[in-house]
Structure formats: C-alpha cells, structure tokens
Amino acid sequence: MNTEGESSKESLANREERILDFWKTHDIFQKSLKNREGKTLYSFYDGPPFATGLPHYGHLLAGTIKDVVGRFATMDGYYVPRRFGWDCHGVPVEYEVEKSLDLTTPGAIEDFGVAKFNEECRKIVFRYVDEWERYVHRLGRWVDFSVTWKTMDASFMESVWWVFRSLYDQGLVYEGVKVVPFSTKLGTPLSNFEAGQNYKEVDDPSVVIKFALHGDPASLLVWTTTPWTLVSNMAAAVGPEITYVRVADKVSGEQWILGQGCLSRWFSDPDSYEILESFLGTALVGKSYEPPFSFFEHKRAEGAYKILSGSFVEESEGTGVVHMAPAFGEADFFVCKEHHVPIVCPVDNHGCFTEEIPEYQGQYIKSCDKGIIKSLKNLGKVFYHGTVMHRYPFCWRTDTPLIYKTVNSWFVSVEKIKDKMLRANQKIHWVPEHIKEGRFGKWLDGARDWAISRNRYWGTPIPIWKSKEGEILVIGSVKELEELTGEKISDLHCHFIDQLKVEKEGKTFQRVPYVFDCWFDSGAMPYAQNHYPFENQKETEAGFPADFIAEGLDQTRGWFYTLTVISSALFDQTAFKNAIVNGIVLAEDGNKMSKRLNNYPSPMGIMNTYGADALRLYLLDSVVVKAEDLRFSDKGVESILKQILLPLTNVLSFFKTYTDLYGFDADNYDKEEITYSEIDRWILSNLYTVVGKVRESMSSYNLNTAVNPFVTFIDDLTNWYIRRCRRRFWESEDTPDRRAAFATLYEVLTVFCRVIAPFIPFISEDIYQQIKTEHSAESVHLCDFPHIDLAKVFPDLEQRMSDAREIVGLGHSLRKEHKLKVRQPLANFYIVGPKDRLDELTSFEQLIAEELNVKNIVFYKETPSFVKTTVKPNFRSLGRKVGEKIKDVQRALSNLSQDQIQQLLKQQYLLLNLGFEEITLGIDDVVISWETDPGYVARSSSLFTVVLDCQLTEDLIVEAISRELVNKINTMRRNHKLHVSDRILLQIHSSEDVEKAFLHYEDYICEETLTVQFEFKDSVEGEEWDINGHPTVIALTVASKAN
C-alpha cells in the first residue's frame, strides 16, 4: 500500500496542478492510448475552434463533455484517438486583421494587397494556440496536440476540393442569382444557417404607405419595416383568398383598401370610417398603381407596378398587402420571377445606394430610412408612421444588421438531397432526444440550397475555372491543377493560384473570384483531416461515421448541419452516430457573456480557485448538458467543491488516518475471511448499483443522469456510512468488525475512483494514488471501468436502508421544527406504516434509535390514537382551480377518513367526491397537519408517519448535558488540531448540574473524548461554553501525544 498521503490541508486546485505534473511526467495520456492499440476503434470528431480568441465557458463545457465520453470509452476497452483541429479560414480571422490594420473602408483590402492581407491572416491564426493548450490542459482534458489538423493546410484544402468536385459531378452544384442573407460589413453573402445564429430584438420603423391605384379613387395601404427598400418597389402582393375592404374616411372621403382582418389594427375608431364594399384578393390582381418613388418608372413597360397574387400573404401582421422589392426578399424574388416582374438591386456590397438612386447615392441604406419617410410624407403618401419591436438577424461575427439581397453565387443543391438528409437524421442518436424531430429535424425539413461562395480572400478558393464563353472546369486535386497549368503547386490559397490560367481547346479559363464558406471546410472535416481520398483511406473509412460528436445547440444549424449535408450527398450516410447537444452558458444575470460588460468570472481564475473538477462537475450536473441554458454562477462551482468534492477528500483522509494508524495491507487481507455487517453490504450494494446506473447512462450518452447517481453516492458514503461506522474504525483492537470496515471502505474507494475517473479525473487520480498497491496500474486512467458485481447487489437491503433513512429524516425534521437538539435524548419514537415495510425495518431499530437519539422505537401498523392527520385546502392553489366550489371542497376534505388521507399521501393525489362531481386534488392543493396529544409531535411522508415523544425527564436532561459536553470537548480537540489518538486532561468550571452529569456519565465522556483525567474547579482559565443553559469554562491540555 502506498502510504505517502498528501496533506488534507492542500487545496484541491493545488492537488490538480500536482496531478497534471504526474500525468505529464509519466506520459499517462499516451500510455492510455497505447494500452488500447489494436482494440475496437471509437471514432470521435472534435469540432474545430478558432484560435484567434481565448476559450470561453462554452468551449470548456463542450470540451468537458468530449473528455468524459473519450475517457469512459477508453476505460471501457476502446481505442479512442483524440486529435485536435483548428478552424483557420473565414470571417473570424479576416475581421481580426481588418481591425488591427484599420482596413475598414470599401476596397481597403484590395488597396492593401490581397497577398499581404492573406499572409497577415496566416500570422494571427494561431495567436492564442498556447493559451488554448493551457486552458485545455488545466481543464484536465486529454487531446493530442502533436497531430493537429488545420483547415488552412494544403492537404486539408485539397480534400475540400475533392468534396466539391464530387458534389459537382453529382449535379449538385450550380451558379445562380438568389436572395440570400448578406453582411454589408463583410461585403459577402452568408448561409441561411449563419443568418439564424444571431437574432436580436430591435426597434425598426413601422410605416404604412399609400399606393394610389390607377383608374380607381382608392389607395392600397402597404406596410413595411424597411423603408429603404421602397425605392426598389416593383410590385404589390395580395392574398387571393383574403377578403379585402374598401373604406372611406367619413370626414375627408379619402378611400383605402386593406385586408378586412387588419381593420382594427389601423382604425381604432370604427365610427371614423365607412366600409364601401368587400371582395376577395383575386379582384385586385393585375391592377396597376403609382409606386412610392419614380426611380425605376421605366420598368413599368417591363411589367412593374402591378398587383400580384401571393399565397404567402397573411393578415396576422401589416395590412394584408405586401410591398415587393424582389431584390431584397426571398418570397418577393420568387413571386416576381414567376410573374416576369423586373428585379432591380440599387445597393452595393457595402450596403450603400448606387448611382441608380441619386438622392441617396453612397449612403448606407439604414441611415436613409428617415429621409425616405420624410420624402414620402412630403408627397402625402404616408398613412401611418411609428416603430415596432421585432426580431432581426445580425451578422454572427461583426454583430451588424444583415440584409437580404440578390447576389450571384455558387450553390449546393441541398433541396435535392433533403430526403437523404432526413434519412440520415433517423440514424442519429440525439441527446436530448427532442433535437432529432425538433430543432434539427425541422431545420432539415426546411433546408434551402446552400450559398457556398464568399466574396472574401482568406479561405479555400472555389476550384472553378471559367472561360469568357461561360464554360467551366471544376478542379478536384492539386495534381489535376498542376497538369492543366504546368505549374508546381505548394499552396492553394487564392494569392498563390489566382494568376494560374488554364488553356484548353483555344479557350482561356480563369478562376472565379470566390472562396468557400468556411462552414464548407468544417463540413468536410471527416475526410479532409486525413487528406482523404489521397491518403489514409483505410483509416478514414474505419472511423466513418463517427461514433460520437458533441457541440452546442447553435451547431444544429451549423456544424451538425454541414456535416450532414456533405455526408448525405457523398455517401447517403450520416456523418456521426451519437450527438450530445449542450445549451448556452450565460452570465449570472441571464445575459450573454460579454468581455465588454465584464459580466462573468475568468474561466482560468475559476479553475485555479475551486479546481477544474469542481467546474466540470458543476457543468455536468446542470441543465446545460440537456441543451438548456445555464446561468453561470461561481457560487455554484464553490458549492460543488464544498458539498461534494471536499467531503469525498475527507473520506480519503479518514481512511488514510486509520489505516496508517492501525495498519491495513490491501495486498494481504483475505476477502473470504471478512464478515461484512449489514451496513457494509448496503454500501457495497449501493456502490455496484451506481456502477450499473453510470454504465447504463453512459451507454445512452446521458451524462446528466450518469452524474446524479455518483453524486448521491458521495452523500450516502460521507453522511451515512462513514458517520455510522466511525466507532468501528476507532477500535484499538484488531477485531473482525474493524477489518470488515477497512475492507469495505477500501473496496468502495478503489471501485468508486474508477467510476468517477471520466468525470472528475483529478480527484479520482488523487484517491487512486493514495490507496493503490504495488501491483496496481500506474494511474486510475489506465484501469478498466468497473462492471457491476451482481453477487454484491441487494435491492431489498437498499430499499430497507432507504426506508430507514426516510424515517430518520422525518425525525430530524421534527426535532428541527420543534427546536429539539439531536443531543437531547428522548424517550419514544413511533413509526406508522405498511406492515410489510415495517417488518423489514426491525433490523434497523437500533440504527434509527441511535440516529434520532431516542430510547425506544415503537412500530404501528395504524396511526395511534394520540395522533390525527388533518387535511385542509391550500387556498392559493385551489382558489384558482375550483373557484366558487372552494367551500364544497373544504367540507369534503374535513370528512376524509384517515385511510383516505393515507391514500393521498401515498399516491400524491386523491379523487375527491363533492356530491355533485368528482375532482382530482394534488398534494400541493392541500395543507397537511397533525393533531397530537400534548407532548407529542408528528409528521408524514408518502409511506410513513412518525411521532416523537417530546416529554423530558430528569434523566434525559442529565444525559443531554453529557452529550453536549462531549460535543464541546471534541470541538476543542479539533480547534487544537490534536491527533485522533492524543489523550487529554480537563479542568472544568460549571454548575452543579453539569458536574453531576459529568460524574454520572464519566466513562462515556472520557471514552468519547480520550480524557484521562478531569477536575472541577471554582475558577478555570479556558474556553467559555453554554452547556444547555449552564455557563461553563473548559481548559484542555494534552496528556500524551500519539507517536
């Protein structure tokens, strides 16, 4: 047995640093991999972060989940390689460079030089790599940083080209013009799933404009929240099946047309207008109108400014008439295209009006809203002007408003493979389960073609070479490009290959000026990380689909989605079999964590203060692993440390103290000779039940339900088993009972440290190192995860102990409620319950008596005559539920029999007959109370009622004083930091009653406190105490120190 235990005074955070050094010095992670080489592969895809910023709690949460699953699978016998990868391309990197070089104006990057700009991007990609490694290392997460993959590596980029070429060969790639989300700050389109990542509640203009009809005295009332799009209006749409009304102002006679269902929204006074007629929307289709502005009046000849039929038009908001600017709305675009209405887009890539709108040329569109509204007011075309609060998409990276805009782009035909994606989703085990048909399934069901081209620079170039005649060549490999150009290729970034032209059949082909959406890189990761299919084919195919993946809820529209798109298209297969989806970690106030607002504690500071295990367990034992949001609290982490981890270290310290004192050789005790007590068998049964529960939860990837059993077990171990068995460990003689206690606790610790190893790897290692033998594995993380030992599982025993603890809990509640210290002995404790359960409790009679400090336990099958349980209405709950029937309920409750009340307690509900109807009452709808004879108090649970005899005799009062003395003297021993075997001398000054109690219980007090001599004096210099109302001074000195 290794007996070199560390000081219990050492902080857990410091112990973790020591354990990190141990893992590093002894190369434990690599040994854990080597131990499993040749075993069944467990494939795991790690979502790549950007190293342009520091890790936040979301990264640490996902990292913890991944680490737990990887460690568990390794301990369960699988080979689990854990490569780390880096996202290197795209907006996050470019944006950082733009800010640092002040390249904020249109054309600034071109002026600076694309080649120089890209190289600056390359330089900062790994700005925080060292910090990332430090955070991951400190968290206790095991990943291999020596074999990382990077999306900017030529090998990775070549595989991305292969993926694209494969999609193109299947007819899944096309060039087109569509309305897509567009970031004016970045000057590039975004994908629909990127646009869905950052919605905000914003105030926007709410304007109703009058479109004067030609040949009709009325005007259409048209609502919009984007006044800037009115300059590009090309049509108006009405719902063909919607009923419209023509109304006239009773004063001015002015006429307007709008949806009948929208009238009350815009006309608060029904007496102010008159309805002249009503008709279906089809009656309006084809009519022409006067547009709000005349910038594109010449487009009327091409079919502009007519009313179209639109099935998408609703009356739930607005006026029932939709203004259509087809360049800036997806539905507008398709309807106008179907009806051959011209499309105009007088907005450049930076969100500024072009020369087509001379009044506002060069101005940012949103800043023109006020001017446009003012102009329309001057023209008498504004019916209403206000504001509206609504959700609006913002750029996920720059946090600026997005617009929807027509762009020329390259698309992947996602809609063609939607059925494949839906089939793939059915093969995925999602945690939580509702993600499958909920957030992810619905997103797949509404999936749109993916705009994959970006007007940016630092990314994987789209490998399309195009001739002036419109012919295209799609390149799928470096070798192919080298053969077509005759040039040696070392780097695939655009500033290395854009000058390369392909001459073929008398035509010159030039690469199109786009890079891939960086999410395309990420979606290709399963193949590109291994340079598939150019290398590592066997390795890649063996690990596809991945056994496991884990990321945040936002990735259901991000990485989870792009992985599924590409794997479905290429292989008609899912990219991963199991997925854990976590929620978002918010600041404690419920807002998003913000560096600017400084509304969250430093992750590294939290780990260095409370320990990484405390942070890991806090996250794992919360709703955030069930895809719900968590308000982060450092007090929550501190609570985990104090209530769970420190008590567990105290168990280890307790075990080490007595094994070192009395000797316990784990290699040389004979298990067959051990006679286990009932409580030993209970804790071992409980232990192996926990093993089974954790295994079962981990097999279904339910980390939250995996954590709960072992957290509960720590409480069972510390607050019940150890507390109940202390005296057995204190025994100075080497008795069979002491050996059984040592053997039991040793087995518990050796098994339990392996159970918790994947979740809280530091404390598990600390326990293991202090109890391992010379024949043990070098580290707990080189051990197998334990299996349930059915021979040691006794469900009936666990149930009996659970009943006993429930009864003890009821008794303690009564003592607390009636201010009766546990150290005050009481005469009787009555237990009422089902006969079969009471019969099973007889063996625990002494245990219950000791726990509650009562002299006598009495079992009753029926409530004794001196106790009556009563039920009254909970007026706050029932008042809302039954209303005027509350008096009938009150009357019926007063007539309940004791049997009916017991049924209510057991079932937690009751069908209550009011005479004229039956209603269902829940336990929260009533207030339970107990009427007892004087001197008794009672309380019930669903199965048991307990009654405490509170009557105090002189003997009980004297005994209470003796117990209070023991408590205070042992408190002094702890304060003096005495060893558990140090003997002491006492001098005491107190009342005659205290002296009498001490002398009467002399043997008990001296044995419990290791007092070898005591003396009562008239005056003592010592510590002052209140002994049940008797002022007392106690002086303590050490008689003999332990060796």
From Swiss-Prot:
Q: Which GO terms describe its biological process?
A: isoleucyl-tRNA aminoacylation
Record localization:
Cytoplasm
The listed location of motif 'HIGH' region is 49-59
Q: Where is this motif: 'KMSKS' region?
A: 592-596
**HAMAP family, alphabetized:** Ile_tRNA_synth_type2
Which proteins does it associate with, and in what oligomeric form? Answer: Monomer.
What is the protein name given in its UniProt record?
Isoleucine--tRNA ligase
Q: Could you tell me which species this protein originates from? A: Chlamydia caviae (strain ATCC VR-813 / DSM 19441 / 03DC25 / GPIC)
Gene encoding the protein:
ileS
